[in-house]
Amino acid sequence: MSNIRLFFSDTLSANMIDKLDKDQSHYLSKVMRVKENEVFSLFNKEGEWEAKILGISKNIVEFKIIKQLRQKEITKELWLAFSPIKSNYQNFMLQKATELGVTKFLPIIFDRTVVRKINKDRLEKIIIEASEQSNRINVPIIEGAQDLSLIHISEPTRPY
């Protein structure tokens, strides 16, 4: 089986037939140069699945789910609150924190924060790619940028 892993946001089930979006289809067909009947992995919050390519037409890849490889992971919550920083450093921080198991990112705007706007879609894409590469099943959530005074974090109840 190949090492290609892609995030698929929709529900997956055994013997299901579906199509990848345009970007993922381009990645598989043009970048990875996969052919019909080759196998790759898809994952979402419910688990990881083995999929087989049925066909590639008009740059859209059609696949069939063969079997489930792994069940959903139960992980402890690990949040990372950070002040947005310049792009390259922020991308690196998101990648490494995702690899380490962070489950939620909280961008916080402080009085002296230089970068005031974040492109949430771009950051989500970076987080998804880091999840694909690090063999994670669950993809961390990124919240919108908030002022520190609006953040309410309650301490979890402890069993002891």
Language model regions located:
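Conserved functional loop/turn residues at catalytic and ligand-binding sites
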Residues: 33, 101, 157
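Short, well-ordered secondary-structure micro-motifs
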Residues: 117-119, 150
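Ordered, amphipathic secondary-structure segments that act as subunit-interaction surfaces
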Residues: 74-116
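Single conserved hydrophobic/aromatic residue that forms the stacking wall/gate
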Residues: 151-160
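Anionic-ligand binding region
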Residues: 126-134, 139-150
